[in-house]
């Protein structure tokens, strides 16, 4: 994942992630879908706040603002986010459609939350450590700034 974590193929053909931060979970139903998501998302941990998935409008807004921010950042560096991502997707023979990014994010969420969950336990008995799940209850400050909402507003929309 670029930071010491590992993606793993699970028995059912889905893809799991064991992150370097100790988060573990299923992240996609297939390698192609994972790559399509990552071409847009770049980083799975940017999409691990479970509250964004409780409201269709909230996840659509988050994804649109996320892509808008990526486009602005790339433009400042002198290149096109869309062209670079389209080229990358073409090299990997996968689809690239930023307009369907919210649907890809929702597929990630459904994979991450479907039973049975992919988990890891290290050790046994009282000394066992069970890793945190891939989805989080934390509403990060940068995500609040990105969507222009407070944590309270996001939580209210998630109900």
Language model features with spans:
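A C-terminal-region feature
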Residues: 1-159
